[in-house]
Amino acid sequence: IDSDDSSWDEMEMEATIGYIDAGDSYDFEVQVSLSGSYALASSYVGNSVLAFQVSDDNIIDFVEFEAVVEDNFAVSAQGSGNQDVDNGCTDQDYKVDWDVNIKNFGNLPDDFTVSFDTADAVAAAWSITGADDMTVENLLPKAEDGVYSFNVEMTVPSGLAAGTKHGFSMTVTSVGDSSQTQTQEFSATVVHCYGISMTVDKTKDSADPGASSDFTVTVTNDGNGEDTVSYMTMGAQAWTPSLSEMSSTIASGETGQVVFTLTVPADSSAAAKSGMAMVHAYSEACG
């Protein structure tokens, strides 16, 4: 309550008007404003009565005003989002879940319809539980902490490619005012997992002095996404170990080949051996 009148004392909530001639009148204007967003609707708790006392030395009178708080409908849905799932390199399905809160942000009790669109997840054979259409009834207003909580769960199949993403949506609508609606998205994304395996066409070979011997190394990308594999050799430098290439970019489930070559030193004797020589392969996950 406030007033622009010069007689108004804001601290005392009082106006001292002074002398008014008999038969005259004095217009005193006050402004009544609603502060904050938690005031309950008059249709829910009734109107607020504001009383003013008017007095001089001998007569006391009261003036009453009735303040009406209009209905206000609003909704807030919380708990949605995307979750990363790391089961692309396993045979284990993985379950993700969300704790969902539907809050009445209005100023009177309200019902809310909750509907789900699960077409995307269902088409990908990702099963969902807890996503049943429903009506939440008589949810208390914001000032009384009206909230309805539930859980939704989705199963992500194993062995999927990196970046695979599916999900569903939820729409919450106020019954009191259908223009008050909110849609939330729920999804899961399969993250990139890495793995490689190696085979070689032979582990021993022979060659004349000054000649070379080739070993074909096959690398399989066992991860669920494209991987750039780097190679490194180890072996006696006199036998000049070398590789046909230093890296290969390999799609998931595919193979890449690199040729490892050892050259017999020209001055080698018939019994000369290279000793242990190795090829190391490093997935890009190794940094």
Language model features by range: what are they?
Residues 1-287:
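Long beta-sheet-rich domains in secretory-pathway and surface-associated proteins
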